[in-house]
Curated annotation (Swiss-Prot):
Belongs to the insulin family. It is found in: Secreted. Residues 51-90 form a propeptide. This is Gonad-stimulating substance. Its main location: secreted. Heterodimer of a B chain and an A chain linked by two disulfide bonds. It comes from Patiria pectinifera. It comes from the Eukaryota. Keywords: Cleavage on pair of basic residues, Disulfide bond, Hormone, Secreted, Signal.
Length: 116
């Protein structure tokens, strides 16, 4: 019985650790909007001038990181998706550049450094 309790405790700790990482993980970065975005880029560029360059802007854009995705029809697509599919229109991208992306989703310092 103690073995089962230990496994239950380990599973609970693992779930709590994963939840903490999901909510507080730095993978997405901080959200920067308007003046905060400009200051974050300024600071990042000041630091990156002293360090080696990261990825180029064209590399980032090639990864489709800052582009909208085309609509795809699936079996469980909503009525709105079906209407767009039938009309031949594409949904408008929810962001148009790195500034919008950083405001909506957040950016890491390495992502901000591509504009330097």
């Amino acid at each position: 019985m103690t073995s089962n309790n230990r496994h239950l405790f380990q599973a609970t700790c693992l779930v709590l650790l994963l939840l903490h990482a999901a909510f507080h993980g730095g993978a997405l970065g901080e959200k920067y909007c308007d003046d905060d975005f400009h200051m974050a880029v300024f600071r990042t560029c000041a630091v990156s001038k002293r360090s080696q360059p990261g990825m180029s802007l064209s590399d980032v854009l090639t990864m489709n990181r800052f582009r909208g995705h085309n609509i795809k029809r699936s079996i469980d697509s909503t009525l709105e998706d079906n209407a767009f599919f039938m009309s031949g229109l594409e949904k408008r991208s929810e962001y148009s550049g790195i500034a919008s992306y950083c405001c909506l989703h957040g950016c890491t310092p390495s992502e901000l450094s591509v504009v330097c």
